[in-house]
């Protein structure tokens, strides 16, 4: 005996009734009764319907707001010494553990000193950070991806 030889015992599985297909399928109204919301196709009340009164969600007060300001993942100049390589982009910063949130743009700030010439590729950078990296012989490439994301979102 193999797996495909197994069948359920006779009478143990009742066939599905096809409603609305003649007298056996309880005929015309197919067990839905006459007219009304529940007789219609696709009809029914939503899970939060409360019989017509104001729902709980609309009775509770509004709270908070959506801040449209961009929240950055901040990387400071002093932290760049921990990252190996001459080109420091988002993936290099993520590997070094300086950037954790993938949904936020990266911004370079000027706290600390740069000890070597590096090329830093970030979404945004402060003017002081750009000056400090260029003074050390490196360069900062500002991609501005956060602006593109903001335009797409709003």
From Swiss-Prot:
Q: Where is this region: Disordered?
A: 1-54
Q: Which domain of life is it from?
A: Bacteria
Q: Which UniProt keywords apply?
A: Ribonucleoprotein, Ribosomal protein, RNA-binding, rRNA-binding
Which terms under GO biological process does the entry name? Answer: translation
Give any GO molecular function from the UniProt entry: rRNA binding
What InterPro entries does the record tag this protein with?
Answer: Ribosomal_uL15, Ribosomal_uL15/eL18, Ribosomal_uL15/eL18_sf, Ribosomal_uL15_bac-type, Ribosomal_uL15_CS
Q: Which GO terms describe its cellular component?
A: cytosolic large ribosomal subunit
Is RNA-binding there in the keyword field?
yes
Query: What does the subunit section of this Swiss-Prot or TrEMBL entry state?
Result: Part of the 50S ribosomal subunit.
> Which family is it part of?
Belongs to the universal ribosomal protein uL15 family.
Protein name in UniProt: Large ribosomal subunit protein uL15
What organism is this sequence from? Deinococcus geothermalis (strain DSM 11300 / CIP 105573 / AG-3a)
Identify the coding gene: rplO
């Amino acid at each position: 005996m193999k797996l495909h030889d197994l069948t359920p015992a006779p009478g143990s599985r009742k066939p599905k009734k096809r409603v609305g297909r003649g007298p056996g399928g309880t005929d015309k109204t197919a067990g839905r009764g006459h007219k009304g919301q529940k007789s219609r196709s696709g009809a029914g009340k939503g899970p939060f319907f409360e019989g017509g009164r104001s729902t709980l969600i609309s009775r509770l007060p509004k709270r908070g707001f959506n801040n449209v300001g961009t929240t950055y993942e901040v990387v400071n100049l002093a932290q760049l010494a921990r990252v190996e390589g001459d080109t420091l982009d988002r993936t290099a910063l993520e590997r070094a553990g300086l950037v954790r949130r993938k949904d936020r743009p990266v911004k370079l700030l000027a706290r600390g000193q740069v000890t070597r010439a590096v090329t830093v590729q970030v979404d945004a950078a402060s003017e002081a950070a750009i000056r400090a990296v260029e003074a050390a012989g490196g360069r900062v490439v500002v991609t501005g991806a956060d602006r593109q994301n903001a335009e797409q979102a709003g």
